[in-house]
């Protein structure tokens, strides 16, 4: 009789295995909750005002900076207000990051991986009744120049990283109405995104050119305060994350080699579920591969895009596996033909493929372009923002629908098992106990699958959040978000690790004569038990589907002969 380790492993050994895996799961949660900081940190920087040097206005290799030798002389708000034209086309807004702390110069490290900048704009206009409610979707033209230097460079040795003239659309509300001027505060707008944080210091120069013939920036009056929020991945979290990947990677590779070797020792071709398990293990191995170590020595601005692709491949493989995993255990065989993806699951998997391709197109349309222009964002235009929100909304709805459909499939599996259990009393006692044990173990595994799917959906939704923390975890020692992320990541590895063990072919199917010289007394008992069970089933006709790996899937045929 065909069998897997799940079916033939003793209850004591199975309990020990499950206990070890649960302990590893707890350790993954504790690793993120106790040792890792929140995944992301941020700096809030109020822009400094510097007067433009008209002789070098178009020189993209000239930068104004606010700290260090040769820093610009900053312009005060009183000087701006005193000028009739508010120093139009003479002001440069300067952001130098990171900020010093306690008179100590801080610098970015490559462990922080990436940097995202968002900008909040406040502008003023002469008070007038018709201007109290500004028009929606105001277009702002910004000349952006981003520079960098390293800790061994001179204070004035800034090098151009990127330059672009971009348009941003503002949604503003009145914040203060004065006797001579009305102030408006606008929603945050995306400014730039760096896929690699390779340098120590960064400098941002923003200009807001005024041009009457082109009607450029004329509807804003003059700028007041500009606030830049720079969001970076915490280096401490990156170290914990890479430690987790480095530990899990060799274990998954080792169990895949062990699993595939056992499959090939059988005198049959691998079953569909065995192929799916090895594909799933391969996708997880690709995700576990700690490529982020390369960013410590190389500048890899495409690492964010590569990480999204790796995670997308894993999600696609995991979602596909769950559908096939549940479908293969429906206990309904329409024909004796071997199950294939094309014949039985193409409708289910086509939805997963379409969804993953849609998300890939959305991702490549933004982060792919950002490799050339870090100031580009699909969120900058009203239409682009609506399309992006639509993609995220559809992704969330699709994830919820998928989870409900998976719950329905698992419910059908449980229902079919319940229907077939009515045939157990007519069986012999040995076989009845055998199948009751299989059903109990299988139900436990399916519930674990459902829990893994639920946490995966929750993790996917959390991954779409702009901020990497929850408001209620700011004053407690355990970082809930970090614990959740490392816990879910560890859960994927532990779950797939367990499947590769439990669905590997069992040793009890192998002829005992090949190992007679090494067999102990306990093993002889196992072989004798297996032999007696084989005699009990010997009157059954040969299985028409020799590729089945679980006796549960052949339960319906064998019941008829008891």
UniProtKB/Swiss-Prot annotation:
Topology feature Lumenal, residues: 37-239, 292-311, 366-390, 463-482
Mode of membrane association: Multi-pass membrane protein
Region (Disordered): 539-562
GO molecular function, one term: Wnt-protein binding
Bias (Polar residues) ranges: 541-556
Cytoplasmic side: 1-15, 261-270, 333-344, 412-441, 504-562
One Gene Ontology CC term in the entry: neuromuscular junction
Chief location bin: membrane
Glycosylation sites: 58
Keyword Membrane among UniProt keywords: yes
Keywords: Cell membrane, Cell projection, Developmental protein, Endoplasmic reticulum, Endosome, Glycoprotein, Golgi apparatus, Membrane, Postsynaptic cell membrane, Segmentation polarity protein, Synapse, Transmembrane, Transmembrane helix, Wnt signaling pathway
InterPro entries: WLS-like_TM, WLS_GOLD, Wntless
A Gene Ontology biological process term: cuticle pattern formation
Transmembrane segments: 16-36, 240-260, 271-291, 312-332, 345-365, 391-411, 442-462, 483-503
Domain of life, per lineage: Eukaryota
Keyword Membrane on entry: yes
Pfam families per the UniProt record, alphabetical: WLS-like_TM, WLS_GOLD
Compartment(s): Presynaptic cell membrane; Postsynaptic cell membrane; Cell membrane; Endoplasmic reticulum membrane
Reported function: A segment polarity gene required for wingless (wg)-dependent patterning processes, acting in both wg-sending cells and wg-target cells. In non-neuronal cells wls directs wg secretion. The wls traffic loop encompasses the Golgi, the cell surface, an endocytic compartment and a retrograde route leading back to the Golgi, and involves clathrin-mediated endocytosis and the retromer complex (a conserved protein complex consisting of Vps35 and Vps26). In neuronal cells (the larval motorneuron NMJ), the wg signal moves across the synapse via the release of wls-containing exosome-like vesicles.
Subunit and interaction comment: Interacts with wg; in the Golgi. Interacts with Vps35, a component of the retromer complex; wls stability is regulated by Vps35.
PANTHER family named in the record: INTEGRAL MEMBRANE PROTEIN GPR177, PROTEIN WNTLESS HOMOLOG
Family according to the record: Belongs to the wntless family.
Full protein name: Protein wntless
Biological source species: Drosophila willistoni (Fruit fly)
Name of the gene encoding the protein in the UniProt record: wls
């Amino acid at each position: 009789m065909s069998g897997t380790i799940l079916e033939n492993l003793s209850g004591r050994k199975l309990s020990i295995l499950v206990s070890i895996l649960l302990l590893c799961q707890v350790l993954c949660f504790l690793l993120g909750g106790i040792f890792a900081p929140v995944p992301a940190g941020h700096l809030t920087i109020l822009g400094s005002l510097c007067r433009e040097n008209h002789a070098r206005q178009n020189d993209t290799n000239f930068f104004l900076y606010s700290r260090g030798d040769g820093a610009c002389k900053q312009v005060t708000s009183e000087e701006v207000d005193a000028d009739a034209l508010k120093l139009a086309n003479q002001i440069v807004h300067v952001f130098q990051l990171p900020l010093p702390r306690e008179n100590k110069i801080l610098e970015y490290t490559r462990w922080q991986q990436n940097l995202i900048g968002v900008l909040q704009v406040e502008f003023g206009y002469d008070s007038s009744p018709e201007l109290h409610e500004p028009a929606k979707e105001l277009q702002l033209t910004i000349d952006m120049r981003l520079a960098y230097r390293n800790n061994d460079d001179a204070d004035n040795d800034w090098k151009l990283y990127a330059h672009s003239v971009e348009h941003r659309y503002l949604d503003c509300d009145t914040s203060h109405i004065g006797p001579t001027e009305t102030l408006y505060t606008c929603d945050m707008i995306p400014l730039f995104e760096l896929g690699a944080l390779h340098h120590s210091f960064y400098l941002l120069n923003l200009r807001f050119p005024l041009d009457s013939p082109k009607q450029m920036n004329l509807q804003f009056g003059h700028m007041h305060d500009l606030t830049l929020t720079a969001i970076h991945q915490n280096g401490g979290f990156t170290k914990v994350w890479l430690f987790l990947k480095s530990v899990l990677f060799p274990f998954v590779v080792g169990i895949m080699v062990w699993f595939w070797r056992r499959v090939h020792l059988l005198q049959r071709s691998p079953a569909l579920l065995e192929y799916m398990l090895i594909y799933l293990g391969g996708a997880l191995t690709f995700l576990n591969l700690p490529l982020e170590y390369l960013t410590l020595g190389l500048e890899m601005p495409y690492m964010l895009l590569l990480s999204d692709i790796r995670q997308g491949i894993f999600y696609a493989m995991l979602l596909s596996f769950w559908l096939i995993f549940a479908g293969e255990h429906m206990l309904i065989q329409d024909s004796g033909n071997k199950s294939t993806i094309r014949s039985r699951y193409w409708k289910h998997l086509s939805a997963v493929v379409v969804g993953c391709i849609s998300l890939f197109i959305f991702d490549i349309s933004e982060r792919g372009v950002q490799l050339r222009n870090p100031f580009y964002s699909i969120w900058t235009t009203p239409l682009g923002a609506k399309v992006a929100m639509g993609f995220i909304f559809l992704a969330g709805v699709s994830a919820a629908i998928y989870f409900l459909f998976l719950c329905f499939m698992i419910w059908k599996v449980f229902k079919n098992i319940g229907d077939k259990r009515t045939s157990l009393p007519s069986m012999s006692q040995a076989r009845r106990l055998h199948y009751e044990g299989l059903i109990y173990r299988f139900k436990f595994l399916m519930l674990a699958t459902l829990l893994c799917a639920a946490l995966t959906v929750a993790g996917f939704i959390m991954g779409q959040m702009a901020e990497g923390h929850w408001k209620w975890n700011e004053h407690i020692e355990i970082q809930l978000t970090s614990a959740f992320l490392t816990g879910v990541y560890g859960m994927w590895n532990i779950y797939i690790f367990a499947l590769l063990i439990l669905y590997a072919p069992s040793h009890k199917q192998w002829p005992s004569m090949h190992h007679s010289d090494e067999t102990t007394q306990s093993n002889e008992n196992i072989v004798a038990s297996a032999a007696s069970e084989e005699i009990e089933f010997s009157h059954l006709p040969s299985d028409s589907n020799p590729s089945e790996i679980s006796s549960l899937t052949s339960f319906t045929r064998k019941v008829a002969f008891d």
